[in-house]
Every structure is written in C-alpha cells, then in structure tokens.
UniProtKB/Swiss-Prot annotation:
It comes from Bos taurus. It catalyses: D-xylulose + ATP = D-xylulose 5-phosphate + ADP + H(+). One of its GO terms (biological process) is xylulose metabolic process. Substrate binds at H99, R170, D280, N281. This is Xylulose kinase.
C-alpha cells in the first residue's frame, strides 16, 4: 500500500508558444516524468514557424487553435504508450502563453460535455471555434484599439491604476476589440472567450473553465484591486463581453473534477481535481517558489524581472498581476529589451570578445564606478521607451566614451540600477529576508551576479528554470486541493 501511495502525483501542463509540455511531480515535489510535443516539428501540417503564423502585415500573429488541441491528443497518447499510470493523478493544473485568446462557437459547450472516449479531441472539436487562428502575445496589430481603450478610461495612467498595465497591443481586451470591429459576425457567433490557459483547462474539465485572476490581469480588463471585470473597459472593447468571459476566480481555485472523457479514455480517477490554469509567467513565479520580498531575474536576450508585491503602485512601465499563489498579494513583471545582446556588444568592444577579460574589468573597478554611470540601449528599449548610449561622469557631464574597464562596469551597474528603480516605482521594497533568484545566460558569470547583489543589497542564487511554468503548475495542482488555499468553486 505504501508503494502505491508513493506514486501519487500531480500533473503540470504548459501550453506555450512553441510546444505543449507536461511534467508529473510526486508528493516530495520531485519531477519523475516529462514529455512534450513541439508544434513545428511534430505538427508540420499546420505550417507554423516558432509555433505561430506571422501575417503579411508583419503585425498580426496567430496560432491555429486545433494545433493546440491535437498536441494534447498526441502527448496523452505518448504517455499512455509509455505506461504512465493515470490512475495515480490526484490533481492537475497548467499554464498558457499569456494574453492569447480562444473563441468558442455557439453550441461548443454541448460538444465539450458529451465527448466520446473512442475519438481524439481534435476530431470532435473541429467545428467548435468561431475563430480558427487565435491572436497570441506576439501580435502587435491593435494600436488603434489600445488608444481607444485608454481614452475611454481617462488615459494610460488611469488604465494602469485600474488594470495593472497601460494598454498593450498584445493584451487580450484590445485583441477582442479588434475581432469585434473587423469580424463582427464571428464575434456574434462566439459564446465564450477563453485565455489560452482557461481554454486548456476547459479541455480537461469538459466544460468552460473560468479565467483566473492572475492570467486575467494580462487583459487590460480586470480591476486588479477588486478582482472584477471593469465595466468601463468591457464597454470600450465589445458588447456583451462580460457574459462571454464568465466570472473570474482566484488562481488556486479547484474549478472542477476531470471530464469523464479522460477517465474513460486514459484511466484518470474520476475524483482527479482540475486547479485553475494560469499564465506562463505567473506559473513560473510558483515554479521558482518566490516568496514575499523575493525577485527573480531572467538574464536572457531580453531581461525580465519577477517581483512579489504586497502593495503595488501600477505605473506606465511594467505590469502588475494578481499573485497566483496568494490571492491577497500581487506580482509584477518588468521586461527590458536590451539584455544579453547589449552585454555581448560591450564585451566585444571593450574586452576583445572575452568574458574572462569582462570579468576582470568588473573585479578591477569599484562598486559605484567612481560615480561614472551609463545607460546602453542599442535597440529601442521598452522600459522606458528610449534608444542610444548615454554616459555621465561623477560631475553629471555627458561624455561620448569611457575607458574600457569603466565602460563595462557602467553597463552592468546601469542595467541593474534601472531594474531596481523600475521595481521600486511599482511598489517593490528590499526586505531583510529578500533573496534574488537569477537565471539565464548571464547568471553563469559570478562577477555580473556580484554587481546584481551589490545594487540590490541582497544575496543572489542561481536557479534552473527550464521547466518553471510546467513545474509551477504541478506545484499549484498540489497547492489547490490542500488546506493552504481554501478556495473551491467545485
């Protein structure tokens, strides 16, 4: 009996831009199974590149909804063929690429509730969507709708205070507004609009899953303080939108038991719980086990900051989301476009292309760089919108060049100081227990991490986040049915 109990597990799913991935995590929170389906490689018939279709205008970016459905079919069949024991799954949860939206056609809910276990999902859901190619987070075609939304609520700052972000082209409310304006017939035939996360949860539930607070915060529609849809924002985007979205729920809600389709076809236990799916960034916060006061810094092509906040102050830069782990708290996301490519450029220019020389320059210059400060934006930055290289001496005079060692420290200190300043603008404060979790390419350079620790005044730890959204979803599946989160709409 003990041996059987030891195999109890939760599943974490990730419906990301390029693949669907699953992990199984046991009661000790150890990953013992993982698998994935890569869209470009395993579903070539959909003709995606990087999991998406970029349209002729260069701005519209979509993904075929049936590709996501078929990927789930394939991965479950792979698990079955490998002998995976579905009967041991206590609960499951998942993540979806943020902001993307799915449009269920009138009558789709009846199909979802009466699926035949003899047929794959794709075959049965083929006619269930009013929009076959779904807008995703890479889409930037809704500038007009963004301006309309901001104007409707009194400007960008007013929208940010209300929903956690100013209007962004990828945010779901603006995408819905575009579909309503350009394809009103498809909109009128839509009975439910899901995020990618709640769409995936709906497949497992066999009925429409609600949008969770955390992923719902990336829509420009949810009032993040009151956790309700903003009537002003809904009205600015499309008619009858509230009924198409349904009521949002806390991210740790148990939204139901698994559909009988999965019980009969794969052998899931009928009591297997489905915990609300959320966005990939909120799920990553759970996967990295961030706590209040902590920061996660991803140092990649672009640099991303994840912050746990108690009292947020939304600003024009960055995003505030409801926290996926603690419904009373918040998380912030800050993206900086000039990340590793900028560091590599300065390495090439000032350290002969050598990371070893780059590190020696950081070691040979003092903290504070004798008052010399630099900001380096070779591509248009998004936090804030600025371009160019800007160097200042201790006397606050702008200069055109620094000595090589000074240049290297100015770059790294400037990058991390900007992160701290923008984090504090969103309400973040370093606490005595604060820890910084670093990931990405530059996290392998101890001297860069030392500057990060010096700027924030907190210890830095390097973590592996290869599966953080997936693993975070499995952790959340354990978290949902536990006493840690007494929220259930089941």
């Amino acid at each position: 009996m003990a041996e059987r109990a030891a195999r109890h597990c939760c599943l974490g799913w990730d419906f990301s831009t390029q693949q669907v991935k699953v992990v199984a995590v046991d009661a000790e929170l150890s990953v013992f199974y993982e698998d994935s389906v890569h869209f470009d490689r395993d579903l070539v018939e959909f003709g995606t590149q990087g999991g998406v279709h970029v349209h002729k205008d260069g701005l519209t970016v979509t993904s075929p909804v049936l590709m996501w459905v078929q990927a789930l079919d394939i991965i479950l069949e792979k698990m079955k063929a490998s002998g995976f024991d579905f009967s041991q799954v206590l609960a499951l949860s998942g993540a979806g690429q943020q902001h993307g939206s799915v449009y269920w056609k009138t009558g789709a809910s009846q199909v979802l509730t009466s699926l035949s276990p003899d047929l794959p999902l794709r075959e049965q859901l083929q006619a269930c969507f009013s929009i076959s190619n779904c807008p995703v987070w890479m889409d930037s075609s809704t500038a007009a709708q963004c301006r309309q939304l901001e104007a409707a609520v009194g400007g960008a700052q007013a929208l940010s205070l209300l929903t956690g972000s100013r209007a962004y082209e990828r945010f779901t409310g603006n995408q819905i507004a575009k579909i309503y304006q350009q394809n009103p017939e498809a909109y009128s035939h839509t009975e439910r609009i899901s995020l990618v996360s709640s769409f995936a949860a709906s497949l497992f539930l066999g009925s429409y899953s609600p949008v969770d607070y955390s992923d719902g915060s990336g829509m420009n529609l949810l009032q993040i303080q009151d956790k309700v849809w903003s009537q002003a924002c809904l009205g600015a985007c499309a008619p009858r939108l509230e009924e198409k979205l349904g009521r949002p729920v806390p991210s740790c809600s148990i939204v139901g038991a698994i559909s009988s389709y999965f019980v009969q076809r794969y052998g899931f236990p009928p009591e297997c719980k489905v915990v609300a799916f959320t966005g990939d960034n909120p799920a990553s916060l759970a996967g990295m086990r961030l706590e209040e006061g902590d920061i996660a810094v991803s140092l990649g092509t672009s640099d991303t900051l994840f912050l746990w906040l108690q009292e947020p102050t939304p600003a024009l830069e960055g995003h505030i989301f409801c926290n996926p782990v603690d419904p009373q708290h918040y998380m912030a996301l800050l993206c900086f476009k000039n990340g590793s490519l900028m560091r590599e450029k300065i390495r090439d220019e000032s350290a002969s292309g050598s990371w070893s020389k780059f590190s020696k320059a950081l070691q040979s210059t003092g903290m504070g760089n004798s008052g010399n400060l630099g900001f380096y934006f070779d591509v248009m930055e998004i936090t804030p919108e600025i371009i160019g290289r800007h160097r200042f001496t201790a006397e606050n005079h702008e200069v055109s060049a620094f000595p090589q060692d000074v240049e290297i420290r100015a770059l790294i200190e400037g990058q991390f100081m900007a992160k701290k300043i923008h984090a504090e603008a969103l309400g973040y404060r370093v606490m005595p227990k604060t820890k910084i979790l670093a990931t990405g390419g530059a996290s392998h350079n101890r001297d860069i991490l030392q500057v990060l620790a010096d700027v924030f005044g907190a210890p830095v730890y390097v973590i592996d986040t290869a599966n953080s959204a997936c693993v975070g979803s499995a952790y959340r599946a354990f978290h949902g049915p536990s006493l840690l989160c007494l929220v259930s709409i089941y």
